[in-house]
């Protein structure tokens, strides 16, 4: 994930944007930090999903095929 300093800066810029607005440089920094945050979040979510196995009440593996295929691609 993103460092706590970067997350704090994202929150600081969001708060400032609501109160008084951002300069052009701050707006660019905010966009760049948010892009980094979203990329880190997506990578983390994909790793979490690759650890998931869906089992129905009868004990059958009903993991979606798309997820199974994604897991196989990751291993190769």
Swiss-Prot record:
PANTHER family: UPF0291 PROTEIN CBO2609/CLC_2481, UPF0291 PROTEIN YNZC. Belongs to the UPF0291 family. Keywords: Cytoplasm. Transmembrane segments: none annotated. InterPro entries: DUF896 (IPR009242). It is found in: Cytoplasm. It comes from the Bacteria. This is UPF0291 protein Aflv_1503. One of its GO terms (cellular component) is cytoplasm. Residues 56-76 are annotated as: Disordered.
